[in-house]
């Protein structure tokens, strides 16, 4: 016997809600929710779990060896994943079109097969011949026989292929191109993506097959599809990079098997993609002599310390209001630092055109780069080059104070490893690596006084670091 009940369904994304709403809660469209009558069995049915069910057992009796991570063979990717891919896990890799997602995953399949494990690469966007052409270009088309290709867009056919091939790794490129006849909506829609992901996830966990899904992103950078897509999977990775450059980064957003804030660096080239063990060299402008308007900092991207360079240029305005051009740094934060220099250090920089940029396309998003931005602006204002062995780390407050940042010991260790011998930092009890002198400034005025001191000692080490109280102001003249 069945009971009739009412539901409310969006005509655009097919999202179902229990009550009527003027605006769809899923896609945000207005006036698309209509009432529909559905039949349900008396008592209803229970929703099947995505993960295989098991009885209650003591945690000490659970065998965890079968779920140990399997290395992919790509060290930078394994770093983000927490050592490798866990059998039965589902990983979502999202990124902009053309950033290199397919190239990276084809390289993963190649390394996976080289270790004697079978991989199935399913594409709903390319034919098997097109995938083979790309595999030949990056050098992984003929070396191994354990890579299987399938050009399919029906999820049930993909599940049959998994049963037939019996792979240890399945790559689906992409989840938005897969469809199922058991769900309404168009391919790539919210309902279809949710149903396809649930079916693939259930199959992966039931067969202990590692599954990697490729996801599209919207113009705002968010993962396309329902929010539940990120809840269904075990790992969410974002693949980022400037299409005009070769640097690529994989950021962990969610990871049930490791840290969720790791970052892997890659270099995309004509013959594939390679991991970068020491990416700091990409973010530094190698020059033999110091140049005014530059400052070095160490930022933490997740848990990874990266050395970056800030460049500043001040120019006389050509009529009208002064310009502010910022690249790689938050414009609002750059304006705040300029205001602090104007107010507390009495540097008349607001009347100038201000240009700020980072080297190598690096994005400085954390406050630890504030001090480097301030020093770069002051150095450009006074035309005072700083030694290339100095690094600046610290947050600048509106009161002109220099504040501590987390992970200072890790940052200083990375700076020392890169050959820096002078560190301008806020007061703290963090240990300083051997061979490095720490100049501790509590205010922006004291930091600028230290800047003048180390500029006078260019090319030499400071045997005895100077001490400043941080009161008053630094009479920096405008350089020519």
UniProtKB/Swiss-Prot annotation:
SMART domains: AAA (SM00382). Residues 461-470 have a biased composition (Polar residues). A zinc finger (C4-type) spans 10-27. InterPro entries: AAA+_ATPase (IPR003593), DNA_repair_RadA (IPR004504), P-loop_NTPase (IPR027417), RecA_ATP-bd (IPR020588), Ribosomal_Su5_D2-typ_SF (IPR020568), Ribsml_uS5_D2-typ_fold_subgr (IPR014721), Rubredoxin_2 (IPR041166). Residues 353-480 are annotated as: Lon-protease-like. SUPFAM superfamilies: P-loop containing nucleoside triphosphate hydrolases, Ribosomal protein S5 domain 2-like. A motif (RadA KNRFG motif) lies at residues 254-258. Keywords: ATP-binding, DNA damage, DNA repair, DNA-binding, Hydrolase, Metal-binding, Nucleotide-binding, Stress response, Zinc, Zinc-finger. Has a putative N-terminal zinc-finger, a middle region with homology to RecA with ATPase motifs including the RadA KNRFG motif, while the C-terminus is homologous to Lon protease. DNA-dependent ATPase involved in processing of recombination intermediates, plays a role in repairing DNA breaks. Stimulates the branch migration of RecA-mediated strand transfer reactions, allowing the 3' invading strand to extend heteroduplex DNA faster. Binds ssDNA in the presence of ADP but not other nucleotides, has ATPase activity that is stimulated by ssDNA and various branched DNA structures, but inhibited by SSB. Does not have RecA's homology-searching function. Belongs to the RecA family. RadA subfamily. This is DNA repair protein RadA. It comes from Mycobacterium tuberculosis (strain ATCC 25618 / H37Rv). The gene is radA.
């Amino acid at each position: 016997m069945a009971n009739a009940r009412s539901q409310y369904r969006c005509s655009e994304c097919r999202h179902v809600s229990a009550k009527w709403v003027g605006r769809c809660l899923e896609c945000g469209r207005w006036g698309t929710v209509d009432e529909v009558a559905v039949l349900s069995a008396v008592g209803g049915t229970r929703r099947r779990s995505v993960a295989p069910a098991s009885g209650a057992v003591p945690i000490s009796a659970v065998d965890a060896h079968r779920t140990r991570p399997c290395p992919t063979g790509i060290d930078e990717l394994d770093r983000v994943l927490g050592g490798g891919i866990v059998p039965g896990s589902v990983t979502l890799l999202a990124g902009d079109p053309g950033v290199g997602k397919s190239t990276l995953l084809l390289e993963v399949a190649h390394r996976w097969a080289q270790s004697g494990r079978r991989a199935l690469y399913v594409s709903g966007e390319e034919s098997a011949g097109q995938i083979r052409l790309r595999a030949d270009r990056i050098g992984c088309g003929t070396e191994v026989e354990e890579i299987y290709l399938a050009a399919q867009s029906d999820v049930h056919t993909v599940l049959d292929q998994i049963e037939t091939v019996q792979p240890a790794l399945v790559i689906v490129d992409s989840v938005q191109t897969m469809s199922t006849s058991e769900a309404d909506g168009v391919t790539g829609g919210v309902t279809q993506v949710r149903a396809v992901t649930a079916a693939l996830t259930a199959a992966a966990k039931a067969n202990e097959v590692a599954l990697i899904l490729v996801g599209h992103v919207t113009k705002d950078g968010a993962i396309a599809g329902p929010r539940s897509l990120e809840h269904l999977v075990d790992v969410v990775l974002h693949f980022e990079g400037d299409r005009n450059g070769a640097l690529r980064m994989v950021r962990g957003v969610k990871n049930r098997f490791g840290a969720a804030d790791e970052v892997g660096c890659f270099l995309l080239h004509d013959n594939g993609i390679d991991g970068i063990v020491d990416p700091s060299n990409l973010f530094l402008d190698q020059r033999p002599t110091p140049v005014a308007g530059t400052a070095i900092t160490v930022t933490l991207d997740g848990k990874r310390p990266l050395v970056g360079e800030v460049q500043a240029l001040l120019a006389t305005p050509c009529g009208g209001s002064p310009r502010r051009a910022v690249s790689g740094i938050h414009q609002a934060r750059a304006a705040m630092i300029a205001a602090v220099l104007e107010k507390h250090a009495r540097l008349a920089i607001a009347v100038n055109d201000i240009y700020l940029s980072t080297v190598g396309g690096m994005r400085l998003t954390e406050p630890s780069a504030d001090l480097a931005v301030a020093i770069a602006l002051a150095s450009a204002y006074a035309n005072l080059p700083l030694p290339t062995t100095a690094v600046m780390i610290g947050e600048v407050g509106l009161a002109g104070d220099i504040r501590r940042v987390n992970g200072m010991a890790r940052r200083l260790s990375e700076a020392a490893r890169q050959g820096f011998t002078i560190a301008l930092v806020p007061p703290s009890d963090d240990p300083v690596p051997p061979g490095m002198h720490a100049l501790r400034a509590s205010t922006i005025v004291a930091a600028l006084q230290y800047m003048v001191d180390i500029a006078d000692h260019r090319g030499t080490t400071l045997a005895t670091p100077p001490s400043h109280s941080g009161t008053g102001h630094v009479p920096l003249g405008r350089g020519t």
